[in-house]
Amino acid sequence: MKVVSSLKSLKKRDKDCQIVQRRGKIFVINKKNKRFKAKQG
């Protein structure tokens, strides 16, 4: 999982990427291609 300061560019890496908020942190998840996971922090 990548940790980045801005998720905007990582959301555009794949059309199935979506942004979710869990436990106060913001994540990019992709259910079809798991290697596109990222966390903002």
Curated annotation (Swiss-Prot):
Alphabetical UniProt keywords: Ribonucleoprotein, Ribosomal protein
GO molecular function: structural constituent of ribosome
SUPFAM superfamilies listed in its UniProt record: Ribosomal protein L36
Any Pfam family hit: Ribosomal_L36
A biological-process GO annotation: translation
GO annotations of cellular component type: ribonucleoprotein complex; ribosome
InterPro entries recorded: Ribosomal_bL36, Ribosomal_bL36_sp, Ribosomal_L36_bact
Top-level taxon of origin: Bacteria
Family (UniProt): Belongs to the bacterial ribosomal protein bL36 family.
Protein name as catalogued: Large ribosomal subunit protein bL36
Organism of derivation: Rickettsia massiliae (strain Mtu5)
Lineage start: Bacteria, Pseudomonadati, Pseudomonadota, Alphaproteobacteria, Rickettsiales
